[in-house]
Amino acid sequence: TSRGLGDVYKRQETKAIRTVKDNLKEIAAGEKDACEKLMYALILSGLAMQMTGNSRPASGAEHHMVHLWDMEVVNGHLDALHGEKVSAATMLVLLEYKKLADAIRRGACRVHAFTDGDRELLQKTFGRKGILGALEKENTPELLDDVSTETLSGALPEILKIIDLLPAVTDMQEMMSIVGCVSRVRDIGLPGEVIEESLRLAPYTRRRLSLLRLRKMLTY
C-alpha cells in the first residue's frame, strides 16, 4: 500500500539524513561523494512525499512560517532565498519546541480548550491585505475544535519524546554554521519583533494539525 511504502521511505529518509549529518564538512567543501549523498537524501524526501500523498515528510511548521512571510502580512518584502527563509524558520520552530519540551518535563505545561484568540491579530494582518476571507475558508472547520483537552493532555508525554528526538538548539546551530546556513531572522532581513506574531499566525497558512497549531491550546 502507499502507506506501507511511505513508511519504508520514511526509514530510508531518516537513514539518509543521518548520513548527510555525518558528512556536513565534506558537503560544505563540495566533495563529490558527499554531495551525492545529499542529493540522494533530497530524492528520498521527494519520494516520501509522493508515497504519503502530501508534503509533510519535507514540510512542517517551518514551511508554514515561510508561507506567512511570503504573504508579507507581518513583514515587508524579503530578498532572501526560499532555503534561507526555511533555515531561519527551522531555528525559530526548534527553539519553541524545545521550550515546550522543557515545560512538559517540569510539569509546567497546561492544556486548555481552544478559543479563537487571534481574531484581532488576523484582522490586523491578513485583513489589511484583503485575504482574510480566503484564510478563513482554508481553516474552516477549525481543526482544533476536534481536539479534546483530555486527548492532548494524555499526548504530552509522547510529544515530549518526539521533541527530544530533535537536535539540541546548539547542535543545530553548529550544523548550520558548518554548511553556511542562516540561523537568525535578522539574517534574512526580519526584525525580532515579528517572531511572536509569526509563531501565532503561521499555522493558519495551511490547514494542518501541526504542533505549532496545537500550541494554541497550551500555556507554558
Model-derived features: positions:
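Intrinsically disordered or highly flexible coil/loop and linker segments, enriched in small
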Residues: 26-33, 47-55, 74, 78, ...
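Short, charge-rich amphipathic segments
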Residues: 3, 17-32, 130-138, 157, ...
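A conserved active-site cap/scaffold subdomain adjacent to cofactor or substrate pockets
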Residues: 17-24, 33-99
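C-terminal charged capping/lid subdomain of soluble metabolic enzymes
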Residues: 103-220
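Single conserved hydrophobic/aromatic residue that forms the stacking wall/gate
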Residues: 1-9
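Electropositive phosphate-/nucleotide-binding environments in soluble metabolic enzymes
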Residues: 10-21, 28-39, 59, 84-87, ...
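Short alpha-helical scaffold segments that flank and stabilize functional sites
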Residues: 4, 93-96, 201, 205
